[in-house]
Amino acid sequence: MQIAVLLSGGVDSSVALYIMIQKGYKNIKCYYLKIWLEDELSYIGECPWKEDINYVEAVCKKFNVPYEIISLQDEYYKRVVTYAIEELKIGNTPSPDIFCNQRIKFGAFFDKINEHYDLIVTGHYAKIENKNDHYILKQAKDKIKDQSYFLSHLSRKQISKLHFPLGDLLKTEIRQIAQKIDLPNKNRKDSQGICFLGKIKYDEFIKYHLGELKGNIIEQETGKILGTHNGYWFFTIGQRKGIKLSHGPWFVTEKDIQNNIIYISNSINYLKQGKQQFLVHKTNWINKPLNNGDLSAKIRHGEKKIKCKIEMLKNDIIKVDLEEKDYGISPGQFCIFYQEDECLGGAKILKTLT
């Protein structure tokens, strides 16, 4: 069996490689996907991916496996970064990591490698089950680290080639393994945020591409101008961080894109702003829901799932009715559907209702 392992330089993918070797697999080649955007990195004066490469090289040397660096920067910019920028321009909240998995790690990478591989192994926190050639994507044992949300837009064909060795392990167990086998990167911190940013702050990335534009911050209930902001594209519905005003905490409740206005509400009135119903479109079903199964949804990456009902409307639009209110539903985000711990797929949020 020919196996490709995607290494990031982090602990998770390195432990995934170790597990495959421990299981007796021999024909393994590792790949590092270079998707760093050089223009965005120029002002921080260093190349963060070089540290990744050093760790990848050290891990592969330890286990005596070959590795190759594959540059996917052009593909990443065209298929993911451009999408994120266009969504921000129209006031939506993009989810770049979903498309990074669908279009790059398991899209462009699949297209790029000439060798034939029976299995692609990564350090994602998720599970894949195969029941008579029927592939199921499931949540990981570690529900806090679970990444099924970001894998929800893969096709069944993509899933059929994947294996996630960490799906039945907790993060603490993975750290213990790394220490026990003395991995070169055993003490390396986990990466945070969007896959391509690394040391770049998200707001800095947005500023680089969209600049700044002064606008008013208005209290939702009174219409009173409370302050100014640097552009609606820096904010998302439900956001609290970054609103530096007294008498808070304040939360974003609405964005007026035409007039570059951010509406906010304080903690008391904010609780009245929650939504339970919204429309989604552009659905990707890995497996369609069973009629007799309870359905739940994730509006964002994290542990929380909310029970819901769905109604199929015209033009492939789906109405979602949550069992409880959510306070951060924003167009452009993705709603991912689950039955128990199976990830069925997901859809892009079109607009909120009530």
From Swiss-Prot:
GO molecular function per UniProt: ATP binding; tRNA binding; tRNA-uridine 2-sulfurtransferase activity
Q: Provide the residue positions that the database annotates as binding ATP.
A: L6, L7, S8, G9, G10, V11, D12, S13, L33, G123
Q: Does the keyword Kinase apply?
A: no
Catalytic positions are C100, C195
Instruction: Provide one Gene Ontology biological process annotation.
Output: tRNA modification
> What is the similarity comment for this entry?
Belongs to the MnmA/TRMU family.
Subcellular location(s) of the protein: Cytoplasm
Q: Which organism is it from?
A: Borrelia turicatae (strain 91E135)
Q: What is this protein called?
A: tRNA-specific 2-thiouridylase MnmA
Which keywords does this Swiss-Prot/TrEMBL entry list?
ATP-binding, Cytoplasm, Disulfide bond, Nucleotide-binding, RNA-binding, Transferase, tRNA processing, tRNA-binding
Disulphide bonds in the chain: C100-C195
Record-linked InterPro entries: MnmA-like, MnmA-like_C, MnmA-like_central, MnmA-like_central_sf, Rossmann-like_a/b/a_fold, tRNA_2-thiouridylase_MnmA
Region of interest (Interaction with tRNA), residue spans: 145-147
Protein's job: Catalyzes the 2-thiolation of uridine at the wobble position (U34) of tRNA, leading to the formation of s(2)U34.
Q: What is its EC number?
A: 2.8.1.13
Per the record, where is site Interaction with tRNA? H124, Q333
- Organismal lineage: Bacteria, Pseudomonadati, Spirochaetota, Spirochaetia, Spirochaetales
- UniProt KW Magnesium keyword: no
